[in-house]
Amino acid sequence: MFQIAVLCVVFGLWLGVFDLALLAFSAPALRSLAGFPAKARATGIFVVRFLPLTLAAAITLGIFVPAWWVHEPENAEEALTLAQAAAAFVAFAPLGEGLRRAMRMASRTHTRLVDWRRRGQKSGLAASCPFDVVEVYGEGVALCVGGYFKPTIFASIAAMKVLTMRERRAALAHESSHASSLDPLRLLGMEACPDFLRLLSVDAEWRSAFARAVEFAADARASAGDRGTALDLAQALVKVARLGLAAPLKGLSVAPAMSNSVDLKARVDALANGPMDEDRRLPLSSGWALVLVCAAVCVLGTQESETAQRLTEAIVALLR
């Protein structure tokens, strides 16, 4: 128990350091990411937002845990002090709060999806779409994607009726992009990110930037560089918005076709008048970036294990 508590404190300290760094550089980081094409912007925001958690976990597991295992005597038994227990609790608080937020949002989302399925029927539109499409009777939904690992497109019957075939195809392509990118799951992750920034609710600009970015990214993928398809999607968005069918989706991890009127105007303008999004990706995929970070941490851990152990012992002494 003592060893676990101390390593939790180490993790919490690193998480706090990286969270402070991200908080300090949030504005320039978001400005820099805004310069990326729409298709890469959302992924960039997501990766940077989770960077403090990733680095803190990698350093703790890749450096401090092995150092403790190698250098701590097997017969070393120390009692857990009140200060150490309190510090471990504070360090673990972001993880606990993140889990609580995720479970609450997932529960609310599940309840809403069950209601939509109860009021809906599987659509014949699914034949031209790689994902299941459920057409829903009544209000409360216009066009959105729900589900984490097996996403489903939910569409209002009234919304589908007002769209032409080309507009319907473009709208479903937009939602299919959300589904293929697992945007509901990523939105859940952004809402429940287990770090101090989310615990203290000082990450609102990152969450709003990501929510906007996934919509622009889905627009860009749906239009696929074709101006005609982009115009069809713009017309579909305007028509569906005018119906006013969608209920507020705040607190739900679903990817709607439109979130608010301001973003809708900007998206329609980008689709109708903006340049087609160039096919430029991030310099490095998130997967390879994670591999490189872990490799660098492992190399550093073999070289600085004694330093890491001294830091751990200093933390233990400070909290006695």
PLM regions and their residue ranges:
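Cytosolic-facing loops and C-terminal tails of multi-pass membrane proteins
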Residues: 1-3, 16, 88-108, 121-124, ...
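Catalytic zinc-binding patch centered on the HExxH motif and its immediate surroundings
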Residues: 125-151
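Active-site recognition of the HExxH zinc-binding catalytic motif
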Residues: 44, 155, 159-160, 166-194, ...
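Transmembrane alpha-helices and immediately adjacent membrane-cytoplasm interface residues
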Residues: 49-118
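Juxtamembrane "helix exit" motif at the C-terminal ends of alpha-helical transmembrane segments
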Residues: 2, 6, 33, 57-76, ...
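Membrane-interface amphipathic/juxtamembrane segments adjacent to transmembrane helices
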Residues: 29-53, 108-130
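Short helix/loop segments within enzyme catalytic domains
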Residues: 21-22, 26-27, 32, 107-120, ...
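Membrane-anchoring/interfacial helices and their immediately flanking loops
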Residues: 1-34, 220
